[in-house]
Regions:
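Extracellular glycan-associated modules
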Residues: 1-300
Length: 300
């Protein structure tokens, strides 16, 4: 067998002659049948369409999530993001189409039942102001403050909840509507003067209403029935409110835990004045009474 080398051939000389390098470029050696090539092209197109469809669905879901995140009301809105004069009435609209509204989402219904939390900071500098009346802190419901009789200053019938200072005393009154009783009440005694006080109203396990003062569980009350929530607006300082300041009114659609409660107390009130100027120096906050008071009235 002889070998022939030239520019166009490589390999042994056979009866068929040398195998030219140029023959590797021939369609006979590298091209498939037309039907095979066409089938590959269809598979590629189908795979591409599937990939585009998957990307479109992912983009659509992401867009829907972003729109929901942007336009859905917060589950824990800050209704008063700052401090107001407690004699200054404020109405917080619940109609999402109203300018400046801050809608409140209905409570989370856990396995044990309905639950939610309200948090507010109060500073009272004069208990003799409107001493013959209930002094309104805030309530959620209708606009119907009683202006006569023994219950001047109380809203009726909706308090979901309502917070007031009672006449002739320095006591706090929490009112909660329930389905079986129009008005269930919890009293917190001896609200201090000239100090910031954190008041947290928490409903858990559907029937348990807790009131925390400066992070301390001060009263636990067993509601007779399920709390009755409403779609009314939130009203602050109606009928002249009280003498002092209100700060950082906030709602949570769940029963917040003790760690979250403590973080609210540690953060303190928001001292940014809304709608006016604060006179005098910064008041001290966190009355020590609530840290060292007796525990006899904690659950009664």
């Amino acid at each position: 067998m002889s070998y022939l080398f030239n520019n166009n051939s490589l390999g042994p000389v056979s009866e068929g002659g040398p195998l030219n390098i140029s023959s590797y470029s021939s369609n006979k050696y590298v091209s498939g049948s037309p039907s095979f090539l066409q089938s590959n092209s269809l598979v590629a197109k189908f795979a591409f369409l599937i990939m585009v469809l998957i990307l479109f669905i992912l983009a659509l879901r992401l867009g829907a999530w972003l729109l929901t995140w942007v336009f859905t009301p917060s589950s824990s809105p800050i209704l008063i993001n700052g401090m107001i004069n407690a004699k200054q009435m404020m109405r917080i609209e619940q109609d999402p189409s109203a300018p400046g509204s801050k809608p409140i989402i209905r409570s989370v219904n856990e396995n044990a039942g309905l639950e939610f939390t309200w948090s507010v900071w109060m500073f009272v500098d004069d208990f003799t102001y409107k001493q013959n009346e209930y002094k309104h802190v805030f309530h959620k419901g209708n606009d119907n403050i009683n202006l006569s009789g023994d219950s001047i200053g109380l809203n009726y019938p909706n308090n979901g909840p309502g917070l007031y200072i009672t006449p002739h005393t320095n006591n706090l009154l929490v009112i909660m509507n329930t389905f079986d009783k129009i008005k269930e009440e919890v009293t917190i005694k001896d609200l201090p003067m000239n100090k910031w006080v954190s008041v947290i109203i928490r409903v858990s396990n559907q029937h348990v209403l807790d009131v925390y003062i400066n992070g301390v569980l001060t009263k636990r009350y067993q509601l007779k029935s399920v709390p009755k929530q409403n779609y009314g607006d939130v009203f602050v300082s109606m009928n002249g409110g009280f003498s002092g300041y209100t700060s950082e009114l906030r709602y949570f659609d769940s029963a917040i835990g003790t760690n979250r409660i403590q973080s609210i107390v540690d953060a303190g009130p928001n001292m940014k004045m809304i709608g006016g100027d604060m006179t005098g120096t910064k008041p001290q906050y966190l009355s020590s009474r609530w840290y060292f008071a007796g525990t006899n009235d904690m659950y009664n």
